[in-house]
Amino acid sequence: MAVPGCNKDNVRAGCRKCGYPGHLTFECRNFLRVDPKRDIVLDVSSTSSEDSDEENEELNKLQALQEKRINEEEEKKKEKSREKIKLKKRRKRSYSSATEEDSAKQKKQKYQKKEKKKEKKNKSKKGKHHKKEKKKRKKEKRSSPYHSELTKK
């Protein structure tokens, strides 16, 4: 019926990594992760005290290398962001100077166009006024007493 050694009372929950009861797997301190990105794990419980000094040195070297890599990556990211900012500033400066030159040219062109239009209007007005004045003179000549005397004779 029931197997004699499989009672709940006899089975203790223990660590799956090291097998010791009293702590769970996520609480295990007998294993160290060398690289958090990779699954490299060192078993501390199985090492002797003589080997621990050597392994500690190796661990320290590995951790130092990791820190260097992380620092280098962060520095690269910072440099890239700085370069982007510099490029944006350069673009803005060059863009603004180009627009100032363009806008100055455009303003000159607009001013010249306005002047030409004014000149054309003045010429056309002069012509119109001149024609009106001619008509008035003709009417005056016809209605003038001297003109009427000449026509009667």
From Swiss-Prot:
Task: Spell out the Basic residues composition-biased ranges.
Answer: 85-94, 106-141
Q: List the residue ranges of the region (Disordered).
A: 44-153
Is this entry keyworded Transmembrane helix? no
List residues modified as Phosphoserine.
S52, S96, S97
Keyword vocabulary terms for this entry: Metal-binding, mRNA processing, mRNA splicing, Phosphoprotein, Zinc, Zinc-finger
Q: Where is the composition biased (Basic and acidic residues)?
A: 66-84
GO annotations under biological process?
mRNA processing; RNA splicing
- Keyword Lipoprotein among record annotations: no
Q: Which residues cross the membrane?
A: none
Output the Pfam families linked to this UniProt entry: zf-CCHC_3 (PF13917)
Quaternary assembly:
Interacts with SREK1/SFRS12.
- Briefly state the protein's biological role: Possible splicing regulator involved in the control of cellular survival.
Protein name in UniProt: Protein SREK1IP1
Q: Which species does the entry assign this protein to? A: Mus musculus
